[in-house]
């Protein structure tokens, strides 16, 4: 699948949870009472789990960047 998210923002929490469940290194962080959150991709080959990419769900272009980083850095869950 080339794109998991459409280019329209924001990413919903339900969408993010579905993707996070399908990848070993995708996380939802900083969940705010207003419903905003950050989608995070970390490099798990590293013992420190270094940050690869992070964006707020409502940021412009977040969907396109997330699709790109999932293709290049996403580790699918087994």
From Swiss-Prot:
SUPFAM superfamilies: YcfA/nrd intein domain. The keyword Ligase does not apply. Keywords: Plasmid. The keyword Disulfide bond does not apply. InterPro entries: DUF905, YkfF-like_sf. Pfam families: DUF905 (PF06006). Belongs to the UPF0401 family. This is UPF0401 protein YubL.
